[in-house]
């Protein structure tokens, strides 16, 4: 074998090795279809959530200020829950436009809207948890609640709740950034390559503060409420128990899927799960479960406000004074037909059932 043959053999081996080495390099996971899906479905869904959430929670705020005038801890929590949901839904037009096109609002608004979204997210869930504790005190510890469930304590705990929500949302403010990739501008939470710890902590924070602690609190409070109501011989007891189950089931049904998907996304970020097909399905699941969770802020006014007899009465009074569209006035008359003239209740003050009835 001469030097030319050796050179040819070496060249052939090099081409062979390069070919198979290239074949073994993992190909990038393409997700163009996911973006197209988001562009088509997310903007109209976000728009619907924005409209219904804005309308429902605005009515709650107006009724509370016009008729209730914040006389109790429950009123304070209802007001703050409505403000939390309003803060949350006001960020949706920006995310809707972003899903349809790209981020065009600059770095400043990217940080502000991301932070506002998270503050609304955390504070809304925290106030739902406080509503559960408020009902627990009113029904299970009725005597003690006369001292604890005051307007002053309601304001103090609300301020503390907003402080915790703001602090929990700081990572969104600090790490949200704008960047351009393939002529497309993004607004995302972006960590440095060596900050895996922050990714894990942020996901765990959402799972723990957004689901585990609130759900655990609600399960404890409502199980004790049901236990107390079982000893009450009352014709409206079954309705109250059904409403308790509805509150827990709706919270679990709307928020648990989103938290599970976020946990799986964390495993992908940590490279525990590595499969392109799974990642694509996970991205679809994130879009679907996130939108499902958004809908819960539209249901909060119905769950915690409109289903109470007193609040329905106030709502009828509000629409009686309206000079708006004909359909709203027709809806007003329909509400009046199904609402009692007086907020009758057979719950006694000693058991606190009247508070549950009004809140639900």
Swiss-Prot record:
Xref: InterPro entries: CCR1-9-like (IPR050119), Chemokine_CCR4 (IPR002239), Chemokine_rcpt (IPR000355), GPCR_Rhodpsn (IPR000276), GPCR_Rhodpsn_7TM (IPR017452)
The terms describing its cellular component in GO are: external side of plasma membrane
Q: Where in the cell is it found?
A: Cell membrane
Biological process GO annotation list? calcium-mediated signaling; cell chemotaxis; homeostasis of number of cells; immune response; inflammatory response; interneuron migration; positive regulation of cytosolic calcium ion concentration; tolerance induction
Cytoplasm listed as a keyword: no
Task: Name the domain of life this protein comes from.
Answer: Eukaryota
Q: Does the keyword RNA-binding apply?
A: no
Task: Supply the Gene3D superfamilies for this chain.
Answer: Rhodopsin 7-helix transmembrane proteins
One of the Pfam families matching this protein, by short name: 7tm_1
User: Where is it made, tissue-wise?
Assistant: Expressed in thymus, spleen, heart, small intestine and lymph node.
Glycosylation: which residues?
A: 183, 194
GO terms of molecular function: C-C chemokine binding; C-C chemokine receptor activity
Record keywords, A-Z: Cell membrane, Disulfide bond, G-protein coupled receptor, Glycoprotein, Membrane, Phosphoprotein, Receptor, Transducer, Transmembrane, Transmembrane helix
Q: Which residues cross the membrane?
A: 40-67, 78-98, 112-133, 151-175, 207-226, 243-267, 285-308
| Cytoplasmic compartment spans | 68-77, 134-150, 227-242, 309-360
| Its membrane topology | Multi-pass membrane protein
Return the similarity comment.
Belongs to the G-protein coupled receptor 1 family.
State the protein's purpose. High affinity receptor for the C-C type chemokines CCL17/TARC and CCL22/MDC. The activity of this receptor is mediated by G(i) proteins which activate a phosphatidylinositol-calcium second messenger system. Could play a role in lipopolysaccharide (LPS)-induced endotoxic shock. In the CNS, could mediate hippocampal-neuron survival.
Protein's recorded name? C-C chemokine receptor type 4
Taxonomy of the source species = Eukaryota, Metazoa, Chordata, Craniata, Vertebrata
């Amino acid at each position: 074998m001469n030097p030319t043959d050796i050179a040819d053999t070496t060249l052939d081996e090099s081409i062979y090795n390069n070919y198979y080495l290239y074949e073994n390099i993992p190909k990038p996971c393409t997700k163009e279809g996911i973006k197209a899906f988001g562009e088509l479905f997310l903007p109209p869904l976000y728009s619907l959530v924005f409209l219904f959430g804005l309308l429902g929670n605005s009515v709650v705020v107006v009724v509370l200020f016009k008729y209730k005038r914040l006389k109790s801890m429950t009123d304070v929590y209802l007001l703050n829950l409505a403000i939390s949901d309003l803060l949350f839904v006001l960020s949706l037009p920006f995310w809707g436009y972003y899903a349809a096109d790209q981020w065009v609002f600059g770095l400043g608004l990217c940080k502000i809207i991301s932070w506002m979204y998270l503050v609304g997210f955390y504070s809304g869930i925290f106030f739902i948890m406080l509503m559960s504790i408020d009902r627990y005190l009113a029904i299970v510890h009725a005597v003690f609640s006369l001292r604890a469930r005051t307007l002053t304590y309601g304001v103090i705990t609300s301020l503390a709740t907003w402080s915790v929500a703001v602090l929990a949302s700081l990572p969104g403010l600090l790490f949200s950034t704008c960047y351009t990739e393939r002529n497309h501008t993004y607004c995302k939470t972006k960590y440095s390559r060596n900050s895996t710890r922050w990714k894990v902590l942020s996901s765990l924070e959402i799972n723990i503060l957004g689901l585990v602690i609130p759900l655990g609190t609600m399960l404890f409070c409502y199980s004790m409420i049901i236990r107390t109501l079982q000893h009450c011989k009352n014709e409206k007891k079954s309705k109250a128990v059904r409403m308790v189950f509805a509150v827990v089931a709706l919270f679990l049904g709307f928020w648990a899927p989103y938290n599970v998907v976020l946990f799986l996304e964390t495993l992908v970020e940590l490279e525990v799960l590595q499969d392109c097909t799974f990642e694509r399905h996970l991205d679809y699941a994130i879009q679907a479960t996130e939108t499902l969770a958004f809908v819960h802020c539209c249901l909060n006014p119905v769950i915690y406000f409109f289903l109470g007899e007193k609040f329905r009465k106030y709502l009828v009074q509000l629409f009686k004074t309206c000079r708006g569209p004909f359909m709203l006035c027709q809806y007003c008359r329909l509400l009046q037909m199904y609402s009692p003239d007086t907020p009758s209740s057979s719950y006694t003050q000693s058991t606190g059932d009247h508070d549950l009835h009004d809140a639900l």
